[in-house]
């Protein structure tokens, strides 16, 4: 870790704030490093990607799992390859349901520490189940088991993130977004690379700058008891991650939920009352956006929630009919790029809500029952 890596400049004096703020710089550092590794990456990946029946699973635990939820749909449609997202927590408990020995597998394991018991076990199970198995761990910790095991394996290529993304705060912030950007750059370099992604970094930097010292809050302050994040497609993954940030940093004092706008009508909408904040991540795709705006207008007509906020790249009559945030000006972003912008608001909201509720964001679990690196997991050996 660099000697000058301190939270001294953070208004809140927390690692969490520092780690939120340095994200745009960390992304460009990582993608520049991937540029330098491109030849070695291609040597490893190109023979695999030529296999017609190759399965590519994006995996991780908790926030690391949500990376796959956010980017796998776009990677699958963009590349035509068989990308899917399966958490390590599912791979470990039900390997027989997800690991098919008849198909070669590339397992992309995301991990901040690289030491989560399920992450290490998932790699071992994949090797055990699938005769032709390859690994691309993307991790923030050079000393972690994911990285160390991979550099000593013939069937793996280890991708290490910049040291500052190994977040010291409890919640994953710069770690998730840097691993996410890096994976996109690996598999879609013509769209996501160190040059094109500067637009994303600049827009997110503008968001963070616009929030000043964070003291005003992102969505204001009100006595809400629950928050719901809504997003379509991969943005539902961003909504899920946004909800988890609130749960983690407030230690569950603010109940948080997520769904897709269309799915929300099918029962979950029952939770909305006059103590509920609803945040809608509006898609940049003109077709999908219609569904987001339909639900946004419906929630406002219902007049049941305390506040319904839209975050969108551009305004419209429906967006502007109530509380809303318009992203800073930039070129057109596809949703997988826009997800980074939405996460800037969500991370900052969770941080400030934590402080507002009297929590310590870097160590929010006063009881110690929830840990930065998960503890208490017993890994049981597979028996066919």
Swiss-Prot record:
Supply the Pfam families for this chain: SIS
Keywords from UniProt, A to Z, are: Hydrolase, Repeat
- Bridged cysteine pairs (disulfide): none
The protein's GO terms of the molecular function aspect are: carbohydrate derivative binding; hydrolase activity; isomerase activity
Would I find Hydrolase among this entry's keywords?
yes
Domain named SIS: residues? 45-197, 215-364
Tell me where on the tree of life, at the top rank, the source sits.
Answer: Bacteria
User: What Enzyme Commission number does this protein have?
Assistant: 3.5.99.-
Q: Which NCBIfam families match?
A: agaS_fam (TIGR02815)
What job does the chain carry out? Catalyzes the isomerization-deamination of galactosamine 6-phosphate to form tagatofuranose 6-phosphate and ammonium ion.
- Known PANTHER family for this protein? D-GALACTOSAMINE-6-PHOSPHATE DEAMINASE AGAS-RELATED, N-ACETYLGALACTOSAMINE PERMEASE II COMPONENT-RELATED
Protein name, entry field: Putative D-galactosamine-6-phosphate deaminase AgaS
Taxonomic source organism:
Escherichia coli (strain K12)
At the highest ranks, the source species' classification is: Bacteria, Pseudomonadati, Pseudomonadota, Gammaproteobacteria, Enterobacterales
Gene designation per UniProt: agaS
